[in-house]
């Protein structure tokens, strides 16, 4: 018996490689890149929320002995922290309610391979932090 379909496997791989495997590899690289950028944005947003929550309203502490966050100071600090750690990010909102600060950010990320119809993806992050009182004196007694 003589086989006439010799070389058919080579033709199969010649079609399979550019049609299936290369786009799959490009998608994998794009997904890993976006995931890394999203993790960086989340970390920067959390750091900005912590820094913003440390902006104490001194007037409220002095007049009413209440520990709350200064709204204006928190907004300025959040914008500064985000500008320093993630320059491409945009602060969508800084919400201050009493001693809690919630920051919402977004960033447009360009994809390394333009495999998908979208050339860029917008990622979002949200983080909250709370201002809490510490100890009264440095002594442990």
Predicted features and spans:
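Generic secondary-structure boundary/loop-capping signal
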Residues: 31, 108-110, 120
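Alpha-helical assembly-interface signal, strongest on the long, hydrophobic N-terminal helix that forms
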Residues: 1-72
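Low-complexity, flexible helical/coil segments
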Residues: 6, 51, 82, 86-90, ...
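Short secondary-structure transition/capping segments
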Residues: 4-8, 99-106, 134-141
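Short, functionally important structural connectors and interaction interfaces within domains
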Residues: 26, 107-108
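Low-complexity, S/T/G/P-rich flexible repeat/linker segments used as non-globular hinges
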Residues: 112-141
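Short amphipathic secondary-structure patches
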Residues: 49-107
């Amino acid at each position: 018996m003589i086989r006439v379909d010799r070389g058919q496997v080579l033709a199969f791989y010649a079609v399979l490689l550019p049609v299936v495997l290369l786009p799959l590899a490009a998608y994998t690289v794009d997904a890993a890149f976006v995931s890394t950028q999203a993790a960086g944005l989340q970390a920067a947003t959390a750091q900005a929320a912590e820094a913003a929550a440390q902006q104490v309203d001194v007037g409220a502490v002095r007049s009413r002995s209440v520990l709350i966050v200064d709204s204006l100071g928190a907004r300025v600090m959040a914008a500064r922290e985000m500008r320093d750690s993630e320059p491409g990010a945009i602060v969508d909102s800084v919400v201050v309610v009493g001693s809690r600060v919630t920051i919402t950010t977004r960033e447009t990320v360009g994809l390394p391979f333009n495999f998908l119809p979208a050339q860029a993806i917008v990622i979002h992050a949200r983080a909250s932090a709370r201002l809490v009182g510490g100890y009264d004196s440095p002594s442990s007694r």
